């Protein structure tokens, strides 16, 4: 039995929730997010809170209810406060710049890398070696950050590459003669 699913998701003022079968739409000041939930989950909206429980006939009902609760809580936080993800570029000549609706990266390749940003995600570069991603969809921000990091992952000898701001890169010792 899921302990996560037992806690209700409190809906703050200024947030609209629409339940249409298993499709839930949440609107707030930062935009609108929609998610389709698993059929094993039953969602009820009452007293500015969403409560979750399993449907009869499903073995994994409580597990799916806990997952649904965590996802919808992230959606509520996203449309009210939003999410940010910071990336750092470590290496000589590694630079980032915002070019329209894309992030331009100079990562030591023979060509510059342009990564388009999906709708709902904004990026800014406080310095040439920092990228800050902002948006309402937690999953989409994480995916864009992972895509940017995948162009040049931190290598284990000098630590050069694109890394998350809170990431600790374990470095190896060089080969001894």
UniProtKB/Swiss-Prot annotation:
Keywords: Ribonucleoprotein, Ribosomal protein, RNA-binding, rRNA-binding. GO terms for molecular function: rRNA binding; structural constituent of ribosome. One of its GO terms (biological process) is cytoplasmic translation. It comes from the Bacteria. PROSITE patterns: RIBOSOMAL_L6_1. Coiled coil: none annotated. GO terms for cellular component: cytosolic large ribosomal subunit. Belongs to the universal ribosomal protein uL6 family. This protein binds to the 23S rRNA, and is important in its secondary structure. It is located near the subunit interface in the base of the L7/L12 stalk, and near the tRNA binding site of the peptidyltransferase center. Part of the 50S ribosomal subunit. PANTHER family: 60S/50S RIBOSOMAL PROTEIN L6/L9, LARGE RIBOSOMAL SUBUNIT PROTEIN UL6M. This is Large ribosomal subunit protein uL6.
């Amino acid at each position: 039995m899921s302990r996560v699913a037992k806690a209700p998701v409190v809906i703050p003022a200024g947030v609209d929730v629409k339940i249409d079968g298993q499709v839930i739409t949440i609107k707030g000041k930062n935009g609108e997010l929609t998610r389709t939930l698993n059929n094993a989950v039953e969602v009820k909206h009452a007293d500015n809170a969403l409560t979750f429980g399993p449907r009869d006939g499903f073995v994994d009902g409580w597990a799916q209810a806990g997952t649904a609760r965590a996802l919808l809580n992230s959606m509520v936080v996203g449309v009210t406060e939003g999410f940010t993800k910071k990336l750092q570029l470590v290496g000589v000549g590694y630079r980032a710049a915002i070019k329209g609706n894309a992030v331009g990266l100079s990562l030591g390749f023979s060509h510059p890398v342009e990564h388009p940003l999906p709708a709902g995600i904004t990026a800014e570069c406080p310095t040439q070696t920092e990228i800050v991603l902002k948006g309402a969809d937690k999953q989409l921000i994480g995916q864009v950050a992972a895509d940017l990091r995948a162009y040049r992952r931190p290598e284990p000898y000098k630590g050069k590459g694109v890394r998350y701001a809170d990431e600790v890169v374990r470095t190896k010792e060089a080969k001894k003669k």
